[in-house]
Amino acid sequence: MKFLDQAKVYIRSGNGGAGAISFRREKFIEFGGPDGGDGGRGGDVWALVVDGLNTLIDYRYQQHFRAKTGGHGKGRNMTGQKGDDIILKVPVGTQIFEEDNTTLICDLTEVGQRYRLAKGGNGGFGNLHFTTSTNRAPRRANPGLSGEERTLWLRLKLIADAGIIGLPNAGKSTFLASVTAAKPKVADYPFTTLYPHLGVARIDAREFVLADIPGLIEGAHEGVGIGDRFLGHVERCRVLFHLISAQEEDVVKAYQIVRNELKAYGNNLNDKTEIIALSQIDTLTIEERKAKQEFLQKVTGKSVMMFSAVSREGLENLLRAGAHIIEMARKKDVVREEQD
């Protein structure tokens, strides 16, 4: 399935149905009086979070959505039928914005959650409503009110416990494929990953969702390369696996490029908990990898792990470190919810 994380849609709720002009007609009753019913309310436009979706690709092919008009009122004081609603099915993690693409309307984070984006117009009054002491047989009814019309942006921010970040060819896709059932494209050239991949990692009876974020390069936050488009997916992650290829000549520079991009992007990405790991260590001697690890630790002041997705050396320890941080974050969320 193709990946699309942003889409523009045009929606319109249904117009209300018109009220009826009708008079009671029964045998032996000469002046039955008005009995025109009200029009039905127009259909609403809803956004609904459904399971099994992880892309907005459907909205590339259909952008216009219009709910049905309410039914017209009828005689015998019968109200018109409500117009059918339109439901926009979206993945977990979808945010909906106004036409300016900056004003947030709603953030949909749970399956089954729904939000009314446009309310249908009210139905018009039938002539029964216009009876007065001086006009017992009004020939007047209201048309229904118009529905709402809006232009909206849908933006998907994948919900993953952990994000995998790093420069192109840092081994992110290989890491994801080695610890989950995901099958991202893996090749020896930059930007192999053109959109995020999700997978579920399991370690010691614990599991968490991993997202492989396409490679960042210097200037990504300004639109260079493809990384800036997907930095938003990092926002929801509890921890970041920051991978640096052990084959890099300057591992510190490789680390700092990505850190600078996170900081420049904003939205507190730079404050995310990270696990730094040298990848592809199977390509170096023990002395070479150790030297790069110690140098990186000295400059950053942080612990640096090492692993190889090919030989699986250090892989389980890396997963355990991530699972522990995620577990602690989940417990904090539970406590926070109980306090609220």
Curated annotation (Swiss-Prot):
Residues 160-327 form the OBG-type G domain. Gene3D superfamilies: GTP1/OBG domain, P-loop containing nucleotide triphosphate hydrolases. The keyword NAD does not apply. GO terms for cellular component: cytoplasm. GO terms for biological process: ribosome biogenesis. Its EC number is 3.6.5.-. One of its GO terms (molecular function) is magnesium ion binding. Mg(2+) binds at residues 173, 193. An essential GTPase which binds GTP, GDP and possibly (p)ppGpp with moderate affinity, with high nucleotide exchange rates and a fairly low GTP hydrolysis rate. Plays a role in control of the cell cycle, stress response, ribosome biogenesis and in those bacteria that undergo differentiation, in morphogenesis control. This is GTPase Obg. It comes from Bartonella henselae (strain ATCC 49882 / DSM 28221 / CCUG 30454 / Houston 1) (Rochalimaea henselae).
